[in-house]
Curated annotation (Swiss-Prot):
Keywords: NADP, Oxidoreductase. Induction: The expression of the dibenzodioxocinones biosynthesis cluster is positively regulated by the transcription factor dibT. Pfam families: adh_short. It comes from the Eukaryota. It is an enzyme of class 1 (oxidoreductase). Belongs to the short-chain dehydrogenases/reductases (SDR) family. This is Short-chain dehydrogenase/reductase GME11359. PANTHER family: PHOSPHATIDYLINOSITOL-GLYCAN BIOSYNTHESIS CLASS F PROTEIN, PHOSPHATIDYLINOSITOL-GLYCAN BIOSYNTHESIS CLASS F PROTEIN-RELATED.
Length: 291
Protein backbone atom coordinates (compact mmCIF):
# COMPACT_ATOMS: atom_id res chain seq x y z
CA UNK A 1 0.00 0.00 0.00
CA UNK A 2 1.34 3.43 -0.89
CA UNK A 3 2.23 5.82 1.89
CA UNK A 4 -0.22 8.57 2.77
CA UNK A 5 0.57 12.16 1.89
CA UNK A 6 0.46 14.68 4.72
CA UNK A 7 1.20 14.03 8.38
CA UNK A 8 0.12 11.11 10.52
CA UNK A 9 -0.60 11.75 14.20
CA UNK A 10 -1.21 9.17 16.92
CA UNK A 11 -2.95 10.76 19.89
CA UNK A 12 -4.04 9.95 23.42
CA UNK A 13 -6.50 12.04 25.37
CA UNK A 14 -8.16 13.40 22.23
CA UNK A 15 -11.75 12.39 22.91
CA UNK A 16 -12.51 15.64 24.75
CA UNK A 17 -10.96 18.82 26.14
CA UNK A 18 -7.60 20.04 24.87
CA UNK A 19 -6.82 16.95 22.84
CA UNK A 20 -10.13 17.05 20.99
CA UNK A 21 -9.79 20.77 20.35
CA UNK A 22 -6.23 20.32 19.05
CA UNK A 23 -7.33 17.69 16.55
CA UNK A 24 -10.35 19.78 15.60
CA UNK A 25 -8.14 22.77 14.79
CA UNK A 26 -5.87 20.66 12.60
CA UNK A 27 -8.88 19.27 10.75
CA UNK A 28 -9.71 22.80 9.64
CA UNK A 29 -6.38 23.13 7.83
CA UNK A 30 -5.76 22.45 4.16
CA UNK A 31 -2.71 20.27 4.86
CA UNK A 32 -3.79 16.60 4.99
CA UNK A 33 -3.71 14.81 8.34
CA UNK A 34 -4.26 11.19 9.24
CA UNK A 35 -5.27 10.75 12.89
CA UNK A 36 -5.20 7.56 14.92
CA UNK A 37 -6.84 8.25 18.25
CA UNK A 38 -7.02 6.00 21.28
CA UNK A 39 -10.25 6.26 23.26
CA UNK A 40 -12.02 4.39 26.03
CA UNK A 41 -15.54 5.22 24.82
CA UNK A 42 -15.49 4.65 21.07
CA UNK A 43 -19.14 5.50 20.47
CA UNK A 44 -19.04 8.86 22.26
CA UNK A 45 -15.71 9.82 20.71
CA UNK A 46 -16.89 8.93 17.22
CA UNK A 47 -20.07 10.93 17.76
CA UNK A 48 -18.01 13.95 18.85
CA UNK A 49 -15.86 13.85 15.72
CA UNK A 50 -18.91 13.29 13.53
CA UNK A 51 -20.03 16.74 14.65
CA UNK A 52 -16.79 18.35 13.43
CA UNK A 53 -17.00 19.93 10.00
CA UNK A 54 -13.96 18.82 7.99
CA UNK A 55 -13.06 17.58 4.53
CA UNK A 56 -13.05 13.79 4.74
CA UNK A 57 -11.28 13.64 1.37
CA UNK A 58 -8.35 15.54 2.88
CA UNK A 59 -8.23 14.14 6.41
CA UNK A 60 -8.94 10.81 8.07
CA UNK A 61 -9.79 10.05 11.70
CA UNK A 62 -9.54 6.49 13.03
CA UNK A 63 -10.59 5.77 16.60
CA UNK A 64 -9.21 2.65 18.27
CA UNK A 65 -9.94 1.20 21.73
CA UNK A 66 -7.57 2.30 24.50
CA UNK A 67 -8.20 2.57 28.23
CA UNK A 68 -5.08 4.10 29.74
CA UNK A 69 -6.23 3.13 33.23
CA UNK A 70 -5.75 -0.49 32.15
CA UNK A 71 -2.24 -1.38 30.98
CA UNK A 72 -3.62 -4.51 29.32
CA UNK A 73 -5.26 -2.41 26.59
CA UNK A 74 -2.08 -0.58 25.61
CA UNK A 75 -0.38 -3.37 23.65
CA UNK A 76 -3.45 -4.20 21.51
CA UNK A 77 -3.80 -0.49 20.73
CA UNK A 78 -0.14 -0.25 19.74
CA UNK A 79 -0.47 -3.30 17.50
CA UNK A 80 -3.61 -1.94 15.80
CA UNK A 81 -1.90 1.42 15.39
CA UNK A 82 1.10 -0.12 13.66
CA UNK A 83 -1.22 -2.08 11.37
CA UNK A 84 -3.15 1.09 10.54
CA UNK A 85 0.07 2.99 9.85
CA UNK A 86 1.34 0.31 7.47
CA UNK A 87 4.00 2.09 5.39
CA UNK A 88 3.08 5.56 6.61
CA UNK A 89 5.42 7.46 8.87
CA UNK A 90 4.37 8.22 12.41
CA UNK A 91 5.01 11.94 12.26
CA UNK A 92 3.76 12.97 15.70
CA UNK A 93 3.00 11.00 18.85
CA UNK A 94 0.73 13.33 20.83
CA UNK A 95 0.67 12.24 24.49
CA UNK A 96 -2.09 14.41 25.89
CA UNK A 97 -4.08 12.12 28.20
CA UNK A 98 -4.23 13.23 31.81
CA UNK A 99 -6.38 13.12 34.91
CA UNK A 100 -6.52 14.76 38.33
CA UNK A 101 -7.76 12.27 40.90
CA UNK A 102 -6.97 11.43 44.51
CA UNK A 103 -5.21 8.16 45.36
CA UNK A 104 -8.11 6.57 47.21
CA UNK A 105 -9.27 3.01 46.87
CA UNK A 106 -7.46 -0.03 45.49
CA UNK A 107 -5.54 0.14 42.23
CA UNK A 108 -7.50 -0.72 39.12
CA UNK A 109 -6.97 -4.10 37.48
CA UNK A 110 -4.63 -5.20 40.25
CA UNK A 111 -2.18 -2.31 39.89
CA UNK A 112 -0.18 -1.22 42.92
CA UNK A 113 -0.31 2.35 41.58
CA UNK A 114 -3.10 4.91 41.72
CA UNK A 115 -5.15 5.48 38.59
CA UNK A 116 -3.85 8.99 37.88
CA UNK A 117 -0.23 7.79 37.84
CA UNK A 118 -1.07 4.93 35.48
CA UNK A 119 -2.93 7.27 33.11
CA UNK A 120 -0.61 10.28 33.32
CA UNK A 121 2.65 8.40 32.98
CA UNK A 122 2.94 4.62 33.07
CA UNK A 123 0.53 3.66 30.27
CA UNK A 124 1.76 6.38 27.92
CA UNK A 125 5.38 5.47 28.68
CA UNK A 126 4.51 1.86 27.85
CA UNK A 127 2.86 2.95 24.61
CA UNK A 128 6.00 4.85 23.65
CA UNK A 129 8.05 1.71 24.36
CA UNK A 130 5.84 -0.30 22.03
CA UNK A 131 6.00 2.29 19.26
CA UNK A 132 9.71 2.96 19.69
CA UNK A 133 10.95 1.23 16.50
CA UNK A 134 8.39 3.12 14.42
CA UNK A 135 9.25 6.40 16.14
CA UNK A 136 12.93 5.97 15.32
CA UNK A 137 12.32 4.85 11.75
CA UNK A 138 9.97 7.79 11.18
CA UNK A 139 12.16 10.39 12.91
CA UNK A 140 8.99 11.28 14.78
CA UNK A 141 8.23 14.16 17.06
CA UNK A 142 6.95 13.10 20.49
CA UNK A 143 4.86 15.85 22.08
CA UNK A 144 4.27 15.38 25.81
CA UNK A 145 1.59 17.63 27.30
CA UNK A 146 3.09 18.81 30.57
CA UNK A 147 2.23 21.41 33.19
CA UNK A 148 3.92 24.43 34.71
CA UNK A 149 3.11 22.85 38.07
CA UNK A 150 6.23 20.70 37.76
CA UNK A 151 8.31 23.63 38.98
CA UNK A 152 6.47 23.54 42.31
CA UNK A 153 7.80 20.05 43.14
CA UNK A 154 10.46 19.99 45.87
CA UNK A 155 13.09 17.40 46.78
CA UNK A 156 11.03 16.26 49.76
CA UNK A 157 8.08 15.68 47.44
CA UNK A 158 10.19 13.53 45.13
CA UNK A 159 11.38 11.39 48.03
CA UNK A 160 7.72 10.71 48.86
CA UNK A 161 6.61 9.81 45.32
CA UNK A 162 6.81 6.07 45.98
CA UNK A 163 4.19 6.54 48.69
CA UNK A 164 2.16 9.35 47.14
CA UNK A 165 1.54 7.53 43.87
CA UNK A 166 0.62 4.17 45.35
CA UNK A 167 -2.97 3.03 45.19
CA UNK A 168 -4.98 4.01 48.27
CA UNK A 169 -2.16 6.21 49.60
CA UNK A 170 -4.77 8.79 50.58
CA UNK A 171 -2.92 11.56 48.75
CA UNK A 172 -5.29 14.23 47.48
CA UNK A 173 -5.80 14.96 43.81
CA UNK A 174 -3.56 18.01 43.71
CA UNK A 175 -0.62 16.17 45.31
CA UNK A 176 -1.06 13.20 42.98
CA UNK A 177 -1.34 15.47 39.93
CA UNK A 178 1.84 17.37 40.81
CA UNK A 179 3.73 14.11 41.39
CA UNK A 180 2.47 12.25 38.33
CA UNK A 181 3.08 15.18 35.98
CA UNK A 182 6.62 15.57 37.33
CA UNK A 183 7.24 11.86 36.73
CA UNK A 184 5.80 12.26 33.25
CA UNK A 185 8.32 15.06 32.65
CA UNK A 186 11.10 12.78 33.88
CA UNK A 187 9.86 10.42 31.19
CA UNK A 188 10.14 13.11 28.52
CA UNK A 189 13.79 13.62 29.47
CA UNK A 190 14.35 9.86 29.48
CA UNK A 191 12.91 9.46 26.02
CA UNK A 192 14.94 12.38 24.73
CA UNK A 193 18.04 10.50 25.90
CA UNK A 194 16.91 7.12 24.57
CA UNK A 195 15.79 8.28 21.13
CA UNK A 196 18.72 10.63 20.62
CA UNK A 197 18.80 12.08 17.13
CA UNK A 198 16.35 9.51 15.74
CA UNK A 199 13.35 11.46 17.08
CA UNK A 200 12.50 14.76 18.76
CA UNK A 201 10.93 14.85 22.22
CA UNK A 202 9.28 17.99 23.57
CA UNK A 203 7.19 18.84 26.60
CA UNK A 204 4.67 21.65 26.23
CA UNK A 205 2.30 23.44 28.58
CA UNK A 206 -1.12 24.65 27.42
CA UNK A 207 -1.27 27.14 30.28
CA UNK A 208 -3.94 27.21 32.98
CA UNK A 209 -6.90 26.12 30.89
CA UNK A 210 -10.50 26.27 32.09
CA UNK A 211 -13.27 23.97 30.96
CA UNK A 212 -11.27 20.85 30.07
CA UNK A 213 -12.87 18.46 32.55
CA UNK A 214 -9.45 17.62 33.98
CA UNK A 215 -10.67 18.04 37.55
CA UNK A 216 -13.97 16.21 37.20
CA UNK A 217 -12.83 13.51 39.62
CA UNK A 218 -12.04 15.97 42.42
CA UNK A 219 -14.40 16.27 45.38
CA UNK A 220 -13.80 20.03 45.51
CA UNK A 221 -13.51 22.01 42.31
CA UNK A 222 -10.86 24.77 42.35
CA UNK A 223 -12.06 28.35 41.99
CA UNK A 224 -10.14 29.88 39.08
CA UNK A 225 -12.11 33.11 38.88
CA UNK A 226 -9.39 35.11 40.62
CA UNK A 227 -6.56 33.87 38.38
CA UNK A 228 -5.78 36.41 35.63
CA UNK A 229 -3.72 34.10 33.41
CA UNK A 230 -6.34 31.42 32.81
CA UNK A 231 -7.04 30.61 29.15
CA UNK A 232 -9.80 29.01 27.12
CA UNK A 233 -9.61 25.54 25.62
CA UNK A 234 -9.13 26.83 22.07
CA UNK A 235 -6.23 29.05 23.13
CA UNK A 236 -4.66 26.24 25.15
CA UNK A 237 -4.86 23.97 22.12
CA UNK A 238 -3.08 26.56 20.00
CA UNK A 239 -0.22 26.50 22.52
CA UNK A 240 0.00 22.72 22.21
CA UNK A 241 -0.02 22.80 18.42
CA UNK A 242 2.94 25.16 18.45
CA UNK A 243 5.02 22.17 19.59
CA UNK A 244 4.00 20.17 16.51
CA UNK A 245 6.03 22.18 14.04
CA UNK A 246 8.20 24.70 15.90
CA UNK A 247 11.74 24.84 14.52
CA UNK A 248 13.43 26.94 17.21
CA UNK A 249 14.23 23.96 19.42
CA UNK A 250 17.23 24.71 21.68
CA UNK A 251 20.48 22.90 20.93
CA UNK A 252 20.78 21.83 24.57
CA UNK A 253 19.06 18.41 24.67
CA UNK A 254 17.85 19.03 28.22
CA UNK A 255 16.03 22.25 27.35
CA UNK A 256 12.77 20.65 26.22
CA UNK A 257 9.96 22.57 27.96
CA UNK A 258 7.94 24.88 25.72
CA UNK A 259 5.77 27.31 27.67
CA UNK A 260 2.22 28.29 26.76
CA UNK A 261 3.51 31.70 25.66
CA UNK A 262 5.96 30.14 23.20
CA UNK A 263 9.27 30.43 25.06
CA UNK A 264 11.64 27.69 26.16
CA UNK A 265 12.08 27.47 29.91
CA UNK A 266 15.70 27.64 31.08
CA UNK A 267 16.85 24.42 32.73
CA UNK A 268 17.21 25.95 36.18
CA UNK A 269 13.41 26.18 36.36
CA UNK A 270 13.18 22.38 36.42
CA UNK A 271 16.67 21.42 37.60
CA UNK A 272 15.38 18.60 39.83
CA UNK A 273 14.13 16.74 36.77
CA UNK A 274 17.61 16.58 35.21
CA UNK A 275 18.77 13.78 37.53
CA UNK A 276 19.35 10.88 35.12
CA UNK A 277 19.19 8.26 37.85
CA UNK A 278 15.79 9.63 38.85
CA UNK A 279 14.65 9.49 35.22
CA UNK A 280 15.81 5.87 34.98
CA UNK A 281 14.05 4.97 38.21
CA UNK A 282 10.65 6.14 36.97
CA UNK A 283 10.92 4.83 33.41
CA UNK A 284 10.65 1.04 33.60
CA UNK A 285 11.53 -1.16 30.67
CA UNK A 286 8.90 -2.86 28.56
CA UNK A 287 9.91 -6.16 30.12
CA UNK A 288 9.43 -4.83 33.65
CA UNK A 289 6.03 -3.39 32.80
CA UNK A 290 4.87 -6.65 31.28
CA UNK A 291 6.27 -8.82 34.09
Amino acid sequence: MAATLGKTIVATGASSGLGFESVKQLLQQSQPYKFIIGARDLKTTQAAFDQVQYDAKTHSVSILPLDLADLRTVKPFAQQTLEALDQDKLDILFLNAGMNKAATGPGLHGSKWCEAYVVNHLSQHYLTQLLRPKLSASHSRVVVVSSGLIRAVKEADIEAFETTLKADSGADGFKVYHASKFVQFLGAHWWRRQLGTSATVLAVSPGLVIGTGLGRHLDTQPNLDHIPDKVTVDKGAKSLLRAFDCNDIPEDPEQIFLTSWGEWWPKDVYSLSLDKSLQDRWCPSQEDIEA
